[in-house]
Regions:
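C-terminal "post-core" interaction segments
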Residues: 1-177
C-alpha cells in the first residue's frame, strides 16, 4: 500500500516510534529494509557462533528516496532503535526527538525441561556503523525538548456520547433514542 502511494506522488513520511518498546527482530529488519536500497541493517555479536548475526537490505526502497522523518523518545527501545539506527546510519531518515532507551541486547529463550524456560542475554545489537545501542540508545539528529501536556479536570467540558443527538444506544439494556 505504501508503494502505491509512493507511485502516486507521496512526498515523504513520518515514522512515529515514540514510546514503541520494540518487538521482533525480523520485523525491525523488514521495516528498515523497506526503506533501504542496500547495505547492512543490523548485526549482532555474542560469545557463540550462533549469536553472530548480520542482516542486509535487499534492493528496492518502497519510497524511492522520498524523505523520512523518524520520531523517537526515551520510550523507543529494542526493535524501534534498530529501525532508527539503520535509517540514521544510511542517512535515509532524519531522526527527531529525544535519546532512545538503549536496549541493544539479544535475548534467547532456553528450554529447561518440558514446561519451563529461561530468557538469557546472548548478544548485543550493532547499528550499520558498528555502534552498540546498549545503554546509549540512538541520539537524534534533531533534539526536541519534552512537551508538557496538562490534563484538565475530567468533569469540565466533558461531552459524553449519550449527550449527542442521534447517539447509538445499547438495545439490550432497554435504552431508546
Amino acid at each position: 500500500r505504501l508503494q502505491r502511494k509512493a507511485e502516486n506522488g507521496l512526498r515523504g513520511i513520518v515514522l512515529d516510534l515514540r514510546n514503541n518498546p520494540g518487538g521482533v527482530l525480523d520485523a525491525a529488519v523488514a521495516v528498515s529494509d523497506a526503506f533501504l536500497d542496500r547495505g547492512r541493517v543490523v548485526s549482532a555479536s555474542g560469545r557463540t557462533d550462533e549469536s553472530q548475526l548480520e542482516f542486509d537490505a535487499q534492493p528496492g526502497d518502497v519510497l524511492e528516496g522520498a524523505p523520512i522523518v523518524v520520531l523517537v523518545d526515551e520510550g523507543s527501545a529494542s526493535a524501534s532503535e534498530i529501525v532508527a539506527g539503520a535509517l540514521q546510519d544510511h542517512q535515509r531518515a532524519v531522526i527527531m526527538g529525544r535519546r532512545t532507551f538503549g536496549k541493544g541486547s539479544v535475548q534467547t529463550i532456553v528450554p529447561i525441561g518440558r514446561q519451563a524456560a529461561i530468557k538469557i542475554t546472548t548478544a548485543r545489537y550493532y547499528t550499520p556503523s558498528g555502534s552498540s545501542i546498549q545503554a546509549s540508545g540512538i541520539e537524534p539528529d534533531i533534539l526536541l525538548a519534552p512537551v508538557k501536556v496538562e490534563l484538565t479536570d475530567s468533569s469540565q467540558d466533558t461531552v459524553r456520547e449519550s449527550q449527542l443527538e442521534g447517539h447509538l444506544t445499547n438495545d439490550a439494556a432497554g435504552e431508546t433514542t
